[in-house]
Amino acid sequence: MNALELIKQQHEEVAGLFKKYEKLAEHADAERQELFEQIADRLGAHAKIEEDYFYPALKKEDTEDDLREAVEEHLSVKRLIADLLEMDASDEEFDAKMKVLQEQVEHHVEEEEGDLFKAARKLLSKDQLDDLGIQLEEEYDTLMEGEPRNDVPAETEHAAPI
């Protein structure tokens, strides 16, 4: 699977988890907490592989603004995750923060799958996208062996470098 297919698959997986969460809203605190943790783990690992491998592969003069915006969006998402990690699903504000998290992720996905995917197709060959996909998947799988959500609070001071 090439890098773009992998990233899109991860986006779709998180979108599916958000949909499950919406159906549980205001019910089943333990299940909602578990879904949040699954979402946070996936988003934490996903942001890490994008910042460490995908975005650097796209760094050119004409992509710099889009990449800066992407890492700022990641920072905003990480800050919400850090806030949610300090809360319980039973807290009054939990569902509202989850909704904001979902909206920010959806916005980021829309821009990334548009502007950055277009840039990737222009800048990287098929072989480069394939190789990058392998690297992204291996790193993601390694991160997911742990609980990557727990690394997120340490990444909330400033946006990742590009």
Predicted segments, located by residue:
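Small-residue-biased structural context
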Residues: M1-I162
